[in-house]
């Protein structure tokens, strides 16, 4: 309901939200109660004689059947009736197939005979389970089930005593017996399931020991379940109220309503019934048959068959995909769609209709580019615009426009389609005969056509990240495609080859406001995914910019003029031309400088920038113009290209966004495109065949290179044939060969490519596109010109397909380049047929890959999002999920948002100790250096003051500590970190803004720097709180930034490098603080979804299988998408598990020792070192069959240490491979030992010497002595020795580990190539140095054993098997490992994702203390609500579980709320807005009855004529551009950050600001006719929202009666205070008194002219004479809405220069001038009495009291009683607070400026009980009203909340002071002698006290008739917030004040600091504004 307006006819009240959803199983009774078909449905037919049949399947009581009919139950028609359930009484109960498994579990937990729980509920284990599984009933059942599984006897009462293994005293036992477990002690059957039937079988029961097996009928189960008690139900995880076990058996079957199973009417034929109806018919048929058979007493087997069939039908109705059961089919053979199939899957009910729906107000068509649109616009075809509508409410301001649209109707554009009257009637203008007759009234809605400037959401699928849906402004254009700016295609990932996009038109102003403030394209320029812009300059603009900014581009005057025409922000000044003679010429760079916004500073390089130049001698000159410098918004040097204008971090666009804001950046994009594209039109850019031709020398080169490459390949082939090729370690011969060939060919391609590149001229158009980065790469050029190169399939050369050859055209076994896919032609030359075929093979693979990848990554993304969708930043800044579990204590561990951080280098990390000291230590000994950098007085101070020197030493010490810390955090010395606030750039900005001359000494005191930085870092708070934990957390969160801050803003660098002045330094600190605060992550931000998208989107870009074929000896690991899948699935068996083993000490540097360790790790079996084996029959060892062994065998047999007699004649001879033995450092002895250890005495093993030429093992079986005996006696079936030996042989070769770790099959050893694996050490000089050390990488993992090996570095050694790390090292380690692995996967192909997203995923997976996979097995096993789980996967299973256990869903997550159509607690939905009812009193009615509100009416009338400063007010001074305007500060908790996105916008109470619009309301939605340019404050008439729109508020409408609920009821006490003289208890007040006519149009109990107490008294208008005829309040001529009284009518504009208080038109009693009258427009800032900008020239308070404003300190100093020296006002007196003269700070409700404060009204006597600080005027409970909040200051910008001196209860302030007593007769307001003109009332008499009733505090300072205060006096400047005569700097004669003379045309009351050019703005204000 929220979002749009109410549907027609419905109430406008919001519906109550659903707070939780309770699941359960329906009991049979409830089903019958709910059913509308009494007696159940008995007939399988639907109709009888053409009528629906009662009791049939289309029972008319169940819902509407015909379109025209009505429902018999609720009499609703088809749209109204929701349908009603019926029921079928089943003849016999059947199992519910959804609960079958649950049924079995419960059966196994309770006794088969007496239904008691098999485990006593007093068992401590059960108690433990109950305690542990609170709120997780499913867990409880699982645990109880595990306990009961082992029990096969139901424990009886007698075994009680010894049950817990504890002897219990007799008494206890009796007790337990009584409340008894008292089982029956019988044996329990095993429950088995087959199909849909359950069997119970007993094993050996005592009585008769044969087995017994019976079929368990559902009745029997029902009986067992029925007897389970409620307590035991609870133990079983059921919830007896919602789900008893016996309800899981179906006895009464509910029949779904007709609307769920509608019949399809085919033309001509009968109705086609829904699948469900068919199924129900089957059930009813078989049910009736079963009932008949039972009654007729049919045979048991017949009934059993029937039951079986019934069971089948009921089961297939629920689930038709049951394993092991036939499908229920229709006659055609199509399986029926069961209830389960309706819910599950993507197209099912949950995902297809609840989570995602089709929507109205959307459009889709093809997109085309249009560079002339702004990036946030979208061109919409007129045909679409005329069809899509937006409902606009009619107000007095838009009535004429809407009336005109209605007149045009639907036929012409722009027009309107419908009118919705305020009673909900729709008038369709398409069919209305004469739309022009229709008259609109305020409150109607008009559905008008979409028009220019509407806000829409534009989207392109797939929506991979939040930049795929952005807000655009509509621009109606002809023809039929959407047009969009080229730069926006990047985030949408769109191109114009036929892509279509979707457009959605939001239907409510709230939605609109949100899109405008949160989702507009310019706000999305920088992505939080990788903190860089996502939009850059592309295509022709980019090509052109590179050409345009070259050194030799000059433009003539005419050209310059033409280009400037396209520069929307041009200020009219043409810069000085670069060349004057012979004729003026401008350079391209100069024109580009005009486009660059603001004072941006930036240094980048051009794409062709040579790296060596930066250190070379010409680094400042940049010969190729390749160094880009933008300084102060001017392009000084350099050619711009993709690096500076593309989507890279730190590009010009990025800096513009961060420094200038999104709006200016938007213009930057538009201006570049319009200007540059139009230059390109003149310049031209083309490409042709000519660009692809190189010179003949190059072609010669290319031929030679290819020839040589072929020759090389042939050589390698020959080597391989001749077996001369040495395999590289870790590779087979074939792999080595392939690698070498590949390398040769790739080198050839690269070499030819680079020679082709070199041959191209500077003006080549291919080259210009590549260089600018617009299209293509170097490889593309070289493929066009030189060689296409090697084609690969699956990372290898084209494989053999046809009998050892690739194509039939080649000979067999041809390994040459041509036949294996090397294409030696270029695209220009054209490919030969075979080349073409190979090229196509390579290309095809890419296509398949892409297709497969899309599906894979789409699913990954969905899982990621589902697992993190509800993770958000809460208002305590923690990151939590929907069940309020903390996932992170601060988002990203630093609490900052991803879009606002940048890459920065930490200055102190890298430099050596010497360099560090030189750069950072403030050297106060070197006087000469000091004089160069600091001013003289500072030098003296520094040199002489020891305290200062200590401070500076301490500063350096601190930095040294920081450096130590950093070197622990970044041990590799890699210091690129993401931090907010780019300090170096901010300093540069400061130097430019304050015009710092880096050659002059600075006036910035070093101590000021040190202290400033200290103070600043105290202000940067991420974690509030003073407890040690919070302090530690705060330190951790801001550690890096603080280190960065201290090292950049250290005194030495400030003095030497930056030379900032004191002023500039202050600005810098302020800027850092505000930027830092803006970077903090917003509460309500859905960071979970953000992280999921940030990871899913790069995954989509990843290629599926990443091959790297140059793998020399690096082992290959899974990468890309497959690896990502492994990680988030937490697969137990990764494809390539691997350890990276780092070594310690010597072994790391010494290859031999490293090899030792390698051998210790690598698993070696005998087979790996065996050359060959043989079995011989060799009965006589002394003369062996193998002659060569004779010699050494004899040695053994001469002196045998074994029983020669037992030796078997069979011999196993193993010959070992010497090379492998030495490789693995094995000796024969070790092997023999292993064999002996394994087989012991059963084998005899002898071996020869390690140095023998053949290494031989001889193995024989030893026969035991007993064996010998047995053989003769009995022939046992024994294996023959030779067979046995053969078995031993295979066992030995494969299973016997010689050394190493079984899991580790192979170990590679190599020296690291990349720095990240080298060992980084810090030398004693403090420099980083990378050492090459040997690294082992393994196939297979065994972390535990490897870590315990000696010489292995246990700290750095890691595994890539996540599960293993978890088991070995625990959860924290696995979190880090997971983060590293994810980082590797993503960074492998060069992407970068901000750490915070990876961290959030890792934390989500590990925050429960175990690994949660991002699959249904992880996500759906969490404690989230069932609705969320069922929206992910396993829909029906989850819902069944939830029902069986009676779970409930607390509706806290995103999915749940979306399903139920509620606002999810996300973003703007995670807080509430409170309306401050008090503020509503100040709302103004919009007088709708003023004559002339017709066509041109409002213009002059509402707002005064345009010339008056108010009409022409400029948007620049509206309160929300004015951080310092306390008018807004007063009611908004975030003063000073008016520009902070989201602070003011979300300020909960901003809605009724001093101006009718709160900053949160976008000015766009109430066009103020008087001043089209002004967003609001100039309109005193916009009421507080909802005011004027409801008819009950219009004073002239009959409904406005004083007692109407919306009106102002005079009796309501809360209303009384607003009229000072209105005292409900005053005796003469009676509602019937003659001058109180409630129906008079002017009646307003709060209007001063209505004086209930005495006709002659109106305290606020002393000149009011009751006898003046025009003032009889009931007289018809006096109506506040009559034109002459319109408070804004031109003659009243108090600010109009001609206005003078004495002018005849000035009538102080006009209602608009009574400060206490609510109709006195307080909603415009110029009228708000509490706003400092309140213009005191308005005579809005009693002007006849000559010296009337006593509390204002600048009050006429000559008044005797208020002379500033009088003790009661002396600035030193304790109760005087100069900064808030009239505000009582300690009482939130006391504001003398509020008209309602009238101390004499009895209800306001401060001592009377009703006067409480909670007085409604300032409800302190409204969020922004914390009286102690410093920003709460209604009247004075300087207000101090703690000043005790103004508390009405403070002794000095007693209203009972003798002079003044509210009850004394002298002050009774009704006493006749009290008349403002009576002599006793002399304001100068001392008894006039500020609390006296006539004192109108709303004007702080001005008395119009007093000669001293004429408003034209030059010193009178009441609105400057600084103005306070007591402030020391202010001297009333100072000329500063003159700028603020209210009559000077620049003065406008709505802005305290308006005259922007005036020097009077003091730096304080400007600080606040930044």
From Swiss-Prot:
Binding of DNA nontemplate strand occurs at 1421
Q: Which residues carry this modification: Phosphothreonine?
A: 1840, 1854, 1863, 1870, 1877, 1885, 1894, 1912, 1915, 1919, 1926, 1929, 1933
The record's section on SMART domains has: RPOLA_N
Omega-N-methylated arginine modification, residue list: 1603
Q: What is its EC number?
A: 2.7.7.6, 3.1.13.-, 2.7.7.48
Q: Which residue stretches does the UniProt record annotate as biased composition, category Pro residues?
A: 1569-1583
* PTM statement from Swiss-Prot or TrEMBL: The tandem heptapeptide repeats in the C-terminal domain (CTD) can be highly phosphorylated. The phosphorylation activates Pol II. Phosphorylation occurs mainly at residues 'Ser-2' and 'Ser-5' of the heptapeptide repeat and is mediated, at least, by CDK7 and CDK9. POLR2A associated with DNA is specifically phosphorylated at 'Ser-5' of the CTD by CDK7, promoting transcription initiation by triggering dissociation from DNA. Phosphorylated at 'Ser-2', Ser-5' and 'Ser-7' of the CTD by CDK9 (P-TEFb complex), promoting transcription elongation.
Q: Where does Mg(2+) 1 bind?
A: 493, 495, 497, 499
* Modified residues annotated as N6-methyllysine in this record: 1838, 1859, 1866, 1873, 1887, 1922, 1936
**Keyword annotations:** Acetylation, Chromosome, Cytoplasm, Disease variant, DNA-binding, DNA-directed RNA polymerase, Host-virus interaction, Hydrolase, Intellectual disability, Isopeptide bond, Magnesium, Metal-binding, Methylation, Nucleotidyltransferase, Nucleus, Phosphoprotein, Repeat, RNA-directed RNA polymerase, Transcription, Transferase, Ubl conjugation, Zinc
The modified positions for N6-acetyllysine read: 1866, 1887, 1922, 1936
Catalytic activity, reaction form = RNA(n) + a ribonucleoside 5'-triphosphate = RNA(n+1) + diphosphate; a 3'-end ribonucleotidyl-ribonucleotide-RNA + H2O = a 3'-end ribonucleotide-RNA + a ribonucleoside 5'-phosphate + H(+)
Indicate where the modification N-acetylmethionine is found in the sequence. Answer: 1
InterPro entries noted in UniProt: DNA-dir_RpoC_beta_prime, RNA_pol_asu, RNA_pol_II_repeat_euk, RNA_pol_N, RNA_pol_Rpb1_1, RNA_pol_Rpb1_3, RNA_pol_Rpb1_3_sf, RNA_pol_Rpb1_4
Pfam hit, one: RNA_pol_Rpb1_3
Q: Which residues bind Zn(2+) 2?
A: 111, 114, 154, 184
Name what cofactor the protein needs. Mg(2+)
Q: Which residues take part in binding DNA template strand?
A: 346, 358, 1416
Q: Which disease is it linked to?
A: Neurodevelopmental disorder with hypotonia and variable intellectual and behavioral abnormalities: An autosomal dominant neurodevelopmental disorder characterized by profound infantile-onset hypotonia, developmental delay with poor speech, delayed walking, and impaired intellectual development. Additional variable features include feeding difficulties, dysmorphic features, and visual defects.
Domain comment from the record reads as follows: The C-terminal domain (CTD) serves as a platform for assembly of factors that regulate transcription initiation, elongation, termination and mRNA processing. The trigger loop allows entry of NTPs into the active site, switching between an open and closed state with each NTP addition cycle.
Identification of the protein by name: DNA-directed RNA polymerase II subunit RPB1
**Which organism is this entry from?**
Homo sapiens
Cite the source lineage: Eukaryota, Metazoa, Chordata, Craniata, Vertebrata
